[in-house]
Amino acid sequence: MSADDLQVTPLGPQHDRAAFSCGEATLDRYLREQASQDRKRSLARCYVLTRVPEPARIVGYYTLSAHSVRLHDLPEDAARGIPYRDVPGVLIGRLALDTREQGRGLGERLLAAAVEHCARLERDLGLRVLVVDALSEGAARFYERNGFRRFGTGELRLFLSLRHVRP
C-alpha cells in the first residue's frame, strides 16, 4: 500500500480504538480510555493515522497540547535572542504505532505529520519549540534521528525548534 493511502484525521467515534495495540499498555489504554476525555476537557487533541481503504482501523496516533518551556532549560544556542523567561511551544504527549505496522517507516511518517501539523499552527500562533517526553532511551534515539535534541545529556525530554520547519 502506498504512502498516498495514509491520512491523518482527528480521533472520532468511527475509529476502532479496541483493535489498536502498540506494545505499550499505557499508550493503548490512553487511546481507549482517556483520549476523548482529554479532548472534552481541552487538555489535548488526538490525531490518528489511518489507511484510506480502512478508515476505522488506527495505524498510529499522536496527541498535541499547548506547552511552554523555561528559557533557561533550553540549550544556549536555542535560547539565543528570546527575551522572555517562557518559550511557547507544543507538546507531543503521546505518539504510538500499531505493532502490525512497526518496522515499515510509518513511525517517521507519523512524527513528520505531527511536526507539519505544528508548523501549520505556528503560522497563526507564537510557537517556538515542539517538545516530547520519550518513554525510553530507544524512543529518545528515534526522536534524535528525526531532528530532535535533548534538553540535557541523558535526558528523555527532547525538543525540536519550529523556527525553520515549514509545512
Identify the function of each model-found stretch:
Residues 46-52:
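Cytosolic beta-strand hydrophobic patch enriched in CBS
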Residues 1-37, 41, 57:
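Short amphipathic alpha-helix that is part of the acyltransferase structural core
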Residues 55, 59-94:
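Conserved acyl-donor/pantetheine-binding loop and adjacent beta-alpha core of acyl/acetyltransferases
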Residues 103-117, 145:
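Conserved acetyl-CoA-binding loop-helix of GNAT-fold acetyltransferases
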Residues 111, 136-139, 155-162:
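Short glycine/proline-centered loop/turn elements that form peptide/ligand docking sites
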Residues 119, 125-129, 133-153:
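Conserved active-site alpha-helix within GNAT-family acetyltransferase domains
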Residues 93-103:
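A short, internal acetyl-CoA/4′-phosphopantetheine-binding micro-motif in the GNAT/acyltransferase core
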